[in-house]
Amino acid sequence: MDNAALNQETEKLKAKLTAAELPAELKTKAEEMIGRLALMGEGQGYSNEYDRVSQYLNWIVALPWNKATEDRLDLTAARQILDKHHYGMGQVKDRILEYLATMSLTRGKAEAGRAPILCLVGLVGTGKTTFGPSLAEALRRKYVRIPFGGLGSALDLRGQSRLHPDAEPGLIIKALKRAGSNNPVMLLDEIDRVTEGARADIMGVLVELLDPEQNAQFTDHYLDYPFDLSQVLFVATGNNTKNVATAVLDRLEIIQMPSYTDEEKIAIAKQYMLPKVLAESGLSQDNLTIDESIWPKIVRPLGFDAGIRTLERTLDGVAGKIAKEIVGGGSKQFHLTAANIKNYLPDY
């Protein structure tokens, strides 16, 4: 590659950097990287170094350093959205509404309160993970989820140094890029399920993420420059707190998610789940009616279950069998009763 072509490549990098809105120190650092690249000329290793510098620039210009969404602090609208997606969960909803009220009263003031870091703890299927998107919708914030189940290294969260081949940022920075804003609702899902060997290191990163005195200067190893996470609204989930470090628990507001009673499951199935399942199966409410007397059989096909995942699978199975009969030329209206319910329940 001749000098003209080399100069053209580095000028493209400079133009990309100039157009980006970056912290001044980070921009200076990137300019120095481009300057060193230009000095390499046609020397050995130029191609690899160009790829590294170009990839780094692509990452830093894509991050939402100064981009934030504006919060909707309307308590009535927030309550309606939370109720639309979730039955019950009164303690969680009340805590969020309390925080929104505080934000509304302190907006623009020096004493503006920090977001509570909620940790929803409960058995499988009790609605922990689905609360994150609802909260984001209520606030009109972006939503991102980071799964901790099976996470095997703190470097997965914090990234690797650019000295390593194929280095890239960690899950936190990747989530911010996906969000496109610096104040998303970030769900840290199943923080109790990281691998045992990496637990101590991962808990150390969690302390930094969740501590308001530290997260304004969170440094990813790949970026090698601090990113302010203080505006992120973190929500964590876990099946229990046994495997969560005390230092992490100290920074969380633990909310226990109770098991659903049969009565609550029936209400959830009627109000939330059945309309959704019918729509996803291409059916309408005219296609299916269900006798009140058989709902207990639908919500408990295998005995007691704390969550609602089995219930959702059961309704999916019912809808699938009905859809098959309609497409096969059968009736278009079905009424489930004690006499025929066994024909539509899935075979477990």
Label each PLM-derived region with a short phrase.
Residues 118, 186-187, 236:
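Hydrophobic positions in the central parallel beta-sheet of the AAA+
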Residues 19-28, 66-68, 180, 240-250, ...:
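Conserved C-terminal "switch" segment of AAA+ ATPases
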Residues 188-228, 250:
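Conserved catalytic/switch belt of AAA+ P-loop NTPases
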Residues 138-168, 175, 195, 264:
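AAA+/P-loop NTPase substrate/partner-engagement loops
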Residues 113-116, 139, 158, 166, ...:
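Short loop/turn elements that form and flank the Walker-type P-loop nucleotide-binding site
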Residues 110-148, 177-178, 207, 211:
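Walker A/P-loop
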Residues 1-106:
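Extended, charged alpha-helical coiled-coil/arm scaffolds that mediate oligomerization and mechanical coupling
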Residues 179-183, 201, 218-238, 288-291, ...:
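AAA+/SF3 P-loop NTPase mechanochemical coupling elements
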